[in-house]
Design a protein with these regions (language model features):
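Extracytoplasmic gate region of multi-pass secondary transporters
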Residues: 24-25, 204-254
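Helix-to-loop junctions at the C-terminal end of transmembrane segments
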Residues: 56-68, 253-266
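Cytoplasmic helix-loop-helix junction between adjacent transmembrane helices
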Residues: 99-137
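Helix-loop-helix hairpin linking two adjacent transmembrane segments in secondary transporters
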Residues: 133-181
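Juxtamembrane intracellular "pre-TM" segments in multi-pass secondary transporters
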Residues: 181-208
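A late C-terminal transmembrane helix in Major Facilitator Superfamily
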Residues: 317-353, 361
Length: 393
């Protein structure tokens, strides 16, 4: 199968994991009424995903490094299977929860494959673009979930919504199951150990993990609490559109920024700009909160914040090599999902005061800015697995 067709199928599957993750998030009120559970329980249908990721990230990454075809195939089957399982009882909380657990178990196997797919099927000059495309697919899935949930629910209830999403997941899974039968065009070094011991003393990877902790944490906190924060200023009704604007900006940023910074070897500069913008944006929003201004500010934030993920993943693959790419991404996304849980809880603790809530987001960005100074200015500064700072072909 052509490498771009493989990437397209993988992107569809990766987007499907986000689509299924956030199925119930935009329609929490309707879900709790239809299923006869509390709004908190309805919210748990999405909340289990980051917790499952924290538990499964490292073993999933190690399995991908050792048996890529089997591991990614399992992720595809679990994603499609979970989507179908929810159709057993569209209005049943029990079936919904069971399906979400199955999808959540498959998600790390899919998302940890982003750099592995790029390394196996793409030549070195195209890998940054392939990693960017894989990352963009995640944001497209998030946006699709946010924008389609309400209309599909109103058009045909939960059954129509779940059927459409299951169909997307099944097609994507079938595509990937065919794609993984294609032999790797670029093999790794079989002598490299897939043990996780190397992570313990790899300071570079810990710094990248800290930055993803901040970045994904900020995004999750904004997505969770923006409505409540702006509600204190009388503008809560605009939160859904503002989050969509932030996500669209991120799709644009992730599509163009990683290749540009990789070509100029300016990865650290981009990450420093990202956390710097985070500090400024939320500090300024606390003082200026007209909807138009907030939209512009969040567009700028989304453009750099969501573009930072493929930059970090690309840098990690360059640093570790393709043999350990699954474990590396698993470790980084574990940190990111943990950040999502922690920062959501931190903001929740001060949610009664919008200034403290926005200040917490700015402080998180400031911590990331300090952390970013520990990165080398350029890849050739000695962090890369290849001494030249260039990818092995």
């Amino acid at each position: 199968m052509n490498r771009w067709a493989i990437l397209a199928g993988f992107g569809m599957l990766a987007g499907s994991t986000q689509l299924l993750w956030l199925t119930y998030a935009p329609i929490t009120t309707q879900v709790h009424q239809a299923m006869g559970v509390s709004e908190g329980a309805a919210g748990d249908l999405a909340g289990i995903f980051p917790l499952m990721y924290v538990v499964l990230a490292l073993p999933s990454g190690r399995w991908l490094d050792a048996r890529f075809e089997r591991a990614l195939s399992a992720g595809a089957i679990l994603t499609a299977g979970g989507g179908l399982l929810r159709l057993a009882g569209p209005s049943s909380f029990g079936w919904a929860l069971a399906g979400q657990f199955v999808v959540a178990a498959g998600q790390p196997l899919v998302l940890n494959s982003i750099t592995k797919v790029a390394a196996r099927y793409f030549p070195a000059p195209q890998r940054t673009a392939a990693i960017s495309a894989g990352s963009v697919s995640l944001y497209v899935g998030i946006l699709a979930a946010v924008l389609s949930g309400g209309p599909l629910l109103h058009a045909g209830g939960l059954r129509l919504l779940l059927t459409v999403q299951a169909a997307v997941a099944v097609v994507a899974a079938a595509w990937v199951l065919l794609a993984v039968r294609t032999p790797a065009a670029f093999g790794g070094d079989p002598s490299v150990s897939v043990s996780l011991r190397w992570l313990r003393h790899d300071r570079f990877m810990w710094v990248l993990a800290g930055l993803l902790f901040v970045g994904m944490g900020v995004f999750n906190a904004v997505a969770t609490w923006l409505d409540t924060i702006l509600g204190h200023f009388g503008r809560g009704g605009a939160a859904g559109y503002l989050i969509a604007i932030m996500t669209v900006a991120g799709i644009l940023g992730a599509a163009v920024v990683p290749q540009a910074v990789a070509a100029r070897d300016r990865r650290r500069a981009l990450l420093q700009v990202t956390v710097g913008v985070t500090v400024v944006v939320f500090a300024v929003i606390s003082g200026l909160h007209p909807v138009g201004f907030v939209a512009v500010a969040l567009f700028a934030e989304g453009f750099v914040l969501l573009a930072a993920l493929p930059v970090v993943l690309d840098w990690s693959e360059l640093h570790t090599g393709p043999e350990r790419a699954g474990s590396a991404v698993g470790f980084l996304l574990l940190a990111g999902n943990l950040g999502g849980v922690v920062l959501v809880l931190v903001v929740q603790g001060v949610i009664g005061n919008p200034y403290l809530s926005l200040g917490a987001l700015s402080l998180a960005g400031l911590a990331g800015l300090v952390l970013s100074t520990r990165l080398p200015a350029h890849v050739a500064g000695g962090t890369s697995a290849a001494s030249t700072g260039q990818r092995r072909p």
